[in-house]
Amino acid sequence: VQNPDEYIRYHARKVAEILFYSAKDTMNDVQKVHYTLKDYDGVSAKSGNPANTSIVYSTQHIEKSANESLYKLDFETRGVLFHELVHAYQFEPKGIGSYSTNKTFWACIEGLADAVRAQAGYFDMSTRKPGGNWMDGYRTTGFFIQWLTTKDPDAIRKFHETVRDLDEWSFDKAMKRMFGDDASIEGLWNEYQAFLSK
């Protein structure tokens, strides 16, 4: 990456464009992003608060991607950056505990980050397979949330709004807020599974 500051700013703008309608929306005030490469067994992690976010990216993961191809390295690095930057900008669900104490909270946070990555085009969509549960987090949840854009192009933004607005967040309450009182997480998940099985 020849200009790391511009590279991160570009991806941060793209994340904001997917999560929000406009710059006038209520959003976390991300001031600084510290991006560090570190030799460890893992992929990447975000820490800190929105104003002062730190992202660590594994040089072991970089090497693994580079050994496949330069295309894979670029594709994976951008995808990981999209995911981690979402964590800086995204709201956290209210009334259900925390990331480390509640699986619904965790599935929402990690699922939304991977939904934005998928929407940005940095997942191989052919890897989507039937099965799992909306509570599985990461790709399983993320692909589902991204699939909701086939029902409403603004589904990711609306999902994110439910995280901000609902006093006691749940996937079912989010689906009802987004698609009406007759919608349910189970019904939409089953529809998504049928889509994947075609």
Give the positions of each predicted feature.
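Active-site recognition of the HExxH zinc-binding catalytic motif
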Residues: 79-92, 110-114
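Short helix/loop segments within enzyme catalytic domains
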Residues: 119-136, 147-165
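Post-HExxH zinc-binding segment in Zn-dependent metallohydrolases
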Residues: 11, 100-142
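Short pre-active-site segment immediately N-terminal to the catalytic Zn-binding motif
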Residues: 61-81, 96-105
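Membrane-helix exit/interface motif
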Residues: 89, 93-94, 121-124
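Lumenal/extracellular "mature" regions of secretory-pathway glycan-modifying transferases
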Residues: 47-64, 101-105, 124-128
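Pan-zinc metallopeptidase signature
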Residues: 141, 148-198
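Auxiliary, metal-adjacent structural segments of Zn-dependent hydrolase domains
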Residues: 1-60
